[in-house]
């Protein structure tokens, strides 16, 4: 359906569409008045034939396509002014020669093609002002080109293979921009340059320039503003450049300049100076005189602190400063006075610190300081403390120490911060004093003005009061008048002659009107008494009294189904009829089925009701269109949810994706069995917002998985409740990218329309691109939206409605593509999802507790509870938990075993628990589960009066209690626990009743009482007990004995049989079975390796563990050999894969600490794990901070939230700064530990580190 609007289109931007093959819209030939057309990045393979009918076309862009020829159609465009076909596959033969003879042709862009020579007849384009032939393979420029194109203003020949330029180039006296970069130009002396007096841009980067082929003087080139002589290996700055007074931009990077010999008064107007990649050691002091300089690049030189002018702070206009890859150890304090600085790069230097004022630069956005190993950042001033607030939490070290209740000493480094802050506070007080004085002066001036106005107002009020008293006296003197006469005199007479005839009510009779389109329409007498229930009527009955006067009765009748406008108009016109007749009667309301007797007598008590309505309403009636069921494929791009429309069929489903089926009353979320749960959850949230915004909450939201789809889903999708027979297969291509969105803006002028595109940076549309006074079209190929602003005029709206219809029809689209109309402020959820950040997200403070979220009338009440801004970081400032001494450990072990009467052990074999042999007591396997039944004596309670009053026979008997310890290996499944709860536990409960206690423990997380029963003989082997006993023992095994915090926690755990697993702080056992029995009958050997820093008191226990536990029950013929660190034999290292580097620094054992960061309590809190922590204490739901004495690691769990990660990062920095103060002699690095890729420095803090567990699901 044609709207007839195409003939008025003056220009349109079709860039970004897919016009490959025969997809170019044929309706373009109807745009006969079109003067400009953009077809950039449209996959064109040839010039469309339709362009030959656009005879008025003046500007044509076909860049970034696949054109190999532009013959034919371009020759049929006589008014062509600009041809832009850059970045194609054009060769010289593919360019028609006759287009250059067009007298109006002014812009020619053939850059980024495959031209080997200048196109034929180019010299005939004498009216050209722009010529771009860059990025081709052109080797020569004909003399005729420069001789004839004397009107050129812009000439770009860069990135070709030119070795020479014709001497006629001097004729281009009007040339303003000349770009020749990246050409050999070995034989071009640049002698013609001084004749180009209009030249303002000269780019000759990488053109083999030397001091000999650059003119010695450029005095006549007063307009030269942009010069690029980079990548030319120049030893010094050419002398001619210093005389360019109007120079704005100078690029001399990539040369061999050692010194910048500029003097004061030169380059006064310079704004950009690039001296990167040279050999500069000093920047001259006169650089600070370049007061207009905004960008200074001096990276990759040899600058030191002395080489930077101390007065650099005078460059107040400086926004960009690059000093990377130099030899800077310090930077001048003046840099902090460059108040407009936005980007500062100081990476790859030798910086030690920075000026304190660097934090006060208001506009600084980029500060690059990486690869400065010894850099110590200055503390931020107290004035900026509010900027440290992070999620309503102040993470400054001083504030957190104050909260933790620790006061800093005067000698600490914090005191220096205070002193600096005092200076800042003094300055702030001066500023505040000046501000108050100014405010006070303004207030005094305002008081004087108000006082003067009050006086004037007082005088005026007195005069007004006297005038009112005088008027009241005059009114009292006048006689009272009839109020009815005043009303009659002031009544506004309205002419009703256009509505009612003159003879209406002038004699006896009855008149009936029906309301039609807001006005009464007189009815024939034949229809009196017939009333439609959807209409309203006006009735006038006039009778003559005996005195001869006329008496009127006016009624208005409302049908049961009459529309609002008919009822209102009947009442209004009844009053108008009374005024028209100058009647004194009242208007009476009559309703269907409730008429008065007086009204019924008018029609002889015979009224006929007819269903329906005979007249039309004055309102426009619209019928809500039927809902169209649509299917969308959900995708996630960052935090945004993208809904891609797909055909409504089973074939569109893919098991790797989630889909949203919008069936109107029900919104279905379908998830394939390979889809991600996060995508499904976000699709569900999108459906919730869609239902709330577009459906007012009337739709139901249902979710279903691929394996279980209810019949209702198939009914909505296919119209049949039965599940389709065919399988759902993967069909969406890998790496599928939806077609790029295009945003058009509708422009209207005197008799023409334009449809340009709004530039979308990186293809991202934002809400602020829409304007209330405009009309926009968002085209996503499968859907097209017309957005109308509130302040758009009527003609613009009409033009947008017609253009969106034409745009929908002329471009090839899927059959399911739809057109939607959006109004500003009432946009649909689907339209909003096309724009980044356009969503109704309520900001939430995740650090608040449930109490603070309650609705409290006064916000101060919440703040007093200290919940809104609460963060518990006190654990970071506590001292490390001291290790238990050997004597204390012995005493604790004795106390824990004092009340033990009996201990029975069981192990899970198959699905049953069997009694564990006594010789295996203390041996555990990581894939098994064990049960230990312990009977403890309970001491009787003593009376307060003492025991003397009791006889020996009356002494209370000893009681007991039973504790069942369930031990689960790290690699064991939960089936063991289920078998225990259904088999053993019921039996134990039946026997011991209320004296039973069940304690479940995991590997390396046992309590002290349980460990005390094994008296340091606690061995954990890898694998399963039954399988290892039958098939194991035939290969070398390495065990590490380690006690964390207390010797009670002594465990011997099997580790990888490699040399790098050794540690000088602990004892190790290496079990080596021999392939053949030795002559002395030994079948193997167990080496007990004593680390040089291990506790000598642990050596005896290491020998016992080796002989009792490491040597298997059938390995009594293994000999035990003690080895001191450094005295190993060749056999020892050979079994471990050769001698390798292992951990010899044992100091980390005394400093290791592990902190847990979480907000599970409703606020952010940090707690410290016990010294006896293990690998499984790294919780995937939280963030951990590990300190090993040399580095502070931040470990991020796989399921932790972004909020926890950000807060933990700030807290780790607080801890790092705190430890720098406490232990300045042992500085720590701040590092990140990636889950699953932890470094050896991180892993050494955990006993027997192994592969990380993967979370279920």
UniProtKB/Swiss-Prot annotation:
Q: Where are the LRR repeats?
A: 6-31, 32-54, 56-77, 78-102, 103-126, 128-148, 149-172, 174-195, 197-221, 222-244, 246-267, 268-290, 292-315, 316-338, 339-361, 363-384
The entry's cellular-component GO terms read: actin cytoskeleton; cytoplasm; nucleus
Biological process terms from the Gene Ontology for this record are: actin filament severing; actin polymerization or depolymerization; barbed-end actin filament capping; myofibril assembly
Q: Which cysteines are joined by disulfide bonds?
A: none
Name the Gene Ontology molecular function terms of this record.
actin filament binding; phosphatidylinositol-4,5-bisphosphate binding
Return the similarity comment. Answer: Belongs to the villin/gelsolin family.
Tell me what this protein is called: Protein flightless-1 homolog
The gene behind this protein is fli-1
